[in-house]
From Swiss-Prot:
Function: Transcription factor that is vital to the development of multiple organ systems. Binds to the core consensus sequence 5'-WGATAR-3'.
SUPFAM superfamilies found in the cross-reference section: Glucocorticoid receptor-like (DNA-binding domain) (SSF57716)
Biased composition (Low complexity): 40-65, 236-251
Protein name (record): GATA-binding factor C
Organism in which the protein naturally occurs: Drosophila melanogaster
InterPro entries noted in UniProt: Transcription_factor_GATA, Znf_GATA, Znf_NHR/GATA
One GO cellular component, as annotated: nucleus
Pfam name, any one: GATA
GO molecular function: DNA-binding transcription factor activity, RNA polymerase II-specific; RNA polymerase II cis-regulatory region sequence-specific DNA binding; sequence-specific DNA binding; zinc ion binding
Keyword terms of this UniProt record: DNA-binding, Metal-binding, Nucleus, Repeat, Transcription, Transcription regulation, Zinc, Zinc-finger
GO biological process: animal organ morphogenesis; cell fate commitment; motor neuron axon guidance; negative regulation of transcription by RNA polymerase II; positive regulation of transcription by RNA polymerase II; tissue development
Region (Disordered): 1-65, 161-198, 232-260
Location within or outside the cell: Nucleus
Regions of compositional bias (Gly residues) in chain numbering: 20-34
Length: 486
């Protein structure tokens, strides 16, 4: 058995001994499941727990070492001496270290927090923090966020005393240890933001911090000490300043409720303005007063008819078209002689240089709809596409099939002339297309009438025509024949 497994077994038996009700008797009652070495460690763990409890009450570390040695000797266990058990009580000989090793720290998390036995394992704190940790009413006192965890460090006695007093008001009934190496999350009701520090406490912490900064130490312990003290200082000062400066005066705008425009009597407006005497005006009256220098009139004045407008209205009242004699039009125009004419007659004369005939006169005025209707949009959308099949081939080329003439009787003579379109590629291609027309379809089992219908195409395929003739027309004609007659 190597040393690691032995140490883990010893740690398990040492922490489980309070629940089993003793060391030697419980080990003996197990039968053959527990070795004598574990039995001895069980009794040693029980004595260790008693000596550990005496430590929290004020006993010295030397007494605990003697107690452990006697317990190991009385247990009769072989294989471990006093030096091997240094992992359990070496932490108590040095008051500056307050953390467990990770393997033993996991075992402490298994202990129930509400255990009422006096042998419960308590956290390792040194003497200045013991007055508020050894309370008679709580079997397991919680640790504060500033003095527990792997990153905790030794601090000045007066600083720890002040921190202990601050932690007394935020204690909880039970707080279990975390099985992680980083510091545990503080309780909800004892977060650093909720801690209120007085002037004297703040001054004591500040003096300790300045003393540590003056030493100039660059070790990791001093650096972590600064981390421990700084949050309490910053949060305390922030809470003190926020407590004195958070006096929110959320009073509604009661003065605006009783305002009324002195000109129009309006009680609600986007923006209240003032006139020259300081009275309130609504936005409209205020703008009018600013632009015109006088109060805004409450009644909109009627449009004043000038002499010129009266004369023009009188002239237009008896105006009639010199051509069609109509009196209603959307626009009055003048002819070449200067006589007034309606819009229709004036446009007609402008376009044709002839007076508009009276037969075209209409009683109603026809207005032009400038919005495109859905039908006109559809018609415009069809334009610009490919020509229909009638653009390539005459509709007379397609006739009903005549069963008496075979399959090829449905084509006219002009249909066969389209075979020359395939010869616009190359002489070799023309020969290939000619063989397709004359012999290709015959090989597929077509009748003699089909071959006779394409005989002209076969004879024309040998001639070479210029390459300027479109090739896609021949392909499209054959594509339409295949889709329509297969």
């Amino acid at each position: 058995m190597d040393m690691t497994s032995t140490a883990e077994a010893a740690a398990r038996s040492w922490y489980d001994s309070p629940r089993l009700g003793g060391g030697g008797s419980s080990g003996g009652g197990n039968g053959g499941g527990v070795s004598p070495q574990t039995n001895g460690l069980g009794s040693a763990g029980s004595s260790l727990a008693h000596s550990h409890h005496s430590l929290s009450s004020g006993a010295s570390s030397a007494g605990s070492s003697v107690g452990v040695g006697s317990a190991l000797g009385g247990g009769g266990g072989s294989g471990l001496d006093t030096s091997d058990m240094s992992a359990f009580y070496a932490l108590e000989s040095n008051g500056h270290h307050r953390r467990y090793y990770p393997s033993y720290h996991q075992h402490t998390s298994r202990m129930p927090s509400t255990h009422a036995s006096p042998q419960v394992c308590r956290p390792h704190f040194h003497t200045p923090l013991s007055p508020w940790l050894t309370s008679e009413h709580k079997s397991f006192a919680p640790a504060s966020a500033w003095s527990m965890g792997q990153f905790a460090c030794p601090q000045e006695p007066q600083v720890e005393h002040k921190l202990g007093q601050m932690g007394q008001s935020h204690q909880t009934t039970a707080a279990g240890q975390h099985s992680f190496p980083f510091p545990p999350t503080p309780p909800k009701d004892s977060t650093p933001d909720s801690v209120q520090t007085g002037p004297s406490e703040y001054q004591a912490v500040m003096n300790a911090f300045m003393h540590q900064q003056a030493t100039g130490s660059t070790s990791l312990t001093d650096a972590s000490c600064a981390l421990d003290i700084k949050p309490s200082i910053q949060n305390g000062s922030a809470s003190g300043s926020s407590g004195s400066g958070t006096t929110h005066t959320s009073t509604p705008k009661q003065r605006e409720e009783g305002r009324e425009c002195v000109n129009c009597g309006a009680t609600s407006t986007p923006l209240w303005r003032r006139d020259g005497t300081g009275h309130y005006l609504c936005n409209a009256c205020g703008l009018y007063y600013k632009m015109n220098g006088q109060n805004r009139p409450l009644i909109k004045p009627k449009r004043r008819l000038t002499l010129q407008s009266l004369q023009s209205a009188a002239k237009r009242a008896g105006t009639s078209c010199a051509n069609c004699k109509t009196t209603t039009t959307t626009l009055w125009r003048r002819n070449a002689s200067g006589e007034p004419v309606c819009n229709a007659c004036g446009l007609y004369y402008k376009l044709h240089n002839v007076n508009r005939p009276l037969t075209m006169k209409k009683e109603g005025i026809q207005t032009r709809n400038r919005k495109l209707s859905s039908k006109s949009k559809k018609k415009k959308g069809l334009g610009g596409g490919c020509l229909p099949i009638g653009g390539h081939l005459g509709m007379g080329d397609f006739k009903p099939l005549d069963p008496s003439k075979g399959f090829g009787g449905g084509f006219s003579a002009s249909m066969a002339q389209h075979g020359h379109l395939s010869s616009g590629l190359h002489p070799a291609h023309a020969h290939m297309h000619g063989s397709w027309y004359t012999g290709g379809m015959g090989a597929l089992g077509a009748s003699s009438g089909l071959q006779g219908g394409f005989s002209t195409a076969g004879s024309l395929s040998g001639a070479v025509v210029p390459h300027s003739q479109p090739y896609h027309l021949g392909l499209s004609s054959m594509g339409t024949w295949r889709t329509d007659y297969t």
